[in-house]
């Protein structure tokens, strides 16, 4: 069994990563933008910016899945140098896709890519392989990425409007319940809501914390001293409202 397979089977953030756009917990305006690309049958060159764990990489992968595109993902915080472009990316981008469509290169955490070498070189790659390949870049800090890259990509900012936060937090509460039920971990709903609100909208952090606390076999008030006291009545109330609404439909 490969390291990648072990990671997907063990880490909850990978095991329960949404595989399609509809299952991503994001504002509808963002999901609609990606759905339009699926309908057109082709991705654009994209620069996705926003806070850690908010769903940028997840929806990029979901887009590739729905387009049935051949893709590779490179984490630039670990592999953000010019040699990566000259070897891995060039070899991938220059070959023909098995499916016949365009290939996609996902460059995760691209704000860690070297701004003096890799970033300027990528500008040329985007143009050189435009007939065969698209590039999706994710970043936490878009100001660390040179302007010529911005101008060659469609920039999508992952901002959550205040009016959407209760709905998304509630949706993630329900998602966490499914995860815990699947893993046979007991939980106190209020404690679960407190953990979500503490780290919202960093969904990756929330799942990682849940997995860490789950070692004890249950998510209950025993972890409150680590989480801190947070008023979460409105998120639990919102979740009950949504479930009630679904039952009426």
Place the predicted regions along the sequence by residue.
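A short, ordered amphipathic alpha-helix with a cationic face
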Residues: 10, 164-167, 180-183, 224-229, ...
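Short polybasic/polar patches that bind polyanions
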Residues: 65, 181, 197
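Helix-loop-helix "sensor" segment of P-loop NTPases
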Residues: 166-193
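Loop-to-helix "switch" segment enriched in basic
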Residues: 216-242
């Amino acid at each position: 069994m490969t390291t990648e397979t072990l990671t997907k089977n063990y880490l909850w953030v990978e095991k329960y990563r949404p595989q399609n756009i509809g299952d991503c917990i994001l504002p509808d305006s963002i999901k609609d933008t990606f759905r339009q690309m699926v309908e057109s049958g082709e991705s654009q060159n994209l620069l996705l910016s926003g806070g850690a764990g908010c769903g940028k990489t997840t929806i990029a992968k979901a887009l590739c899945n729905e387009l049935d595109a051949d893709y590779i993902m490179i984490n630039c915080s670990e592999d953000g140098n010019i040699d990566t472009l000259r070897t891995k990316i060039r070899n991938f981008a220059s070959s023909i896709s098995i499916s016949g469509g365009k290939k996609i290169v996902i460059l995760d955490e691209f704000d860690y890519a070297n701004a003096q070498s890799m970033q300027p070189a990528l500008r040329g790659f985007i143009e050189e392989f435009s007939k065969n390949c698209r590039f999706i870049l994710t970043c936490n800090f878009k100001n660390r990425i040179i302007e010529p890259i911005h101008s060659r990509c469609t920039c999508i900012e992952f901002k959550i409007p205040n009016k959407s936060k209760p709905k998304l937090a509630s949706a993630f509460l329900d998602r966490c319940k499914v995860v815990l039920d699947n893993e046979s971990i007991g939980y106190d709903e209020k404690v679960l809501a407190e953990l979500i609100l503490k780290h919202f909208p960093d969904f990756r952090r929330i799942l990682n914390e849940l997995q860490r606390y789950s070692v004890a076999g249950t998510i209950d008030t025993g972890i409150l001293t680590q989480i801190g006291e947070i008023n979460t009545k409105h998120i639990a109330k919102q979740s009950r409202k949504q479930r009630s609404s679904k039952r009426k439909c």
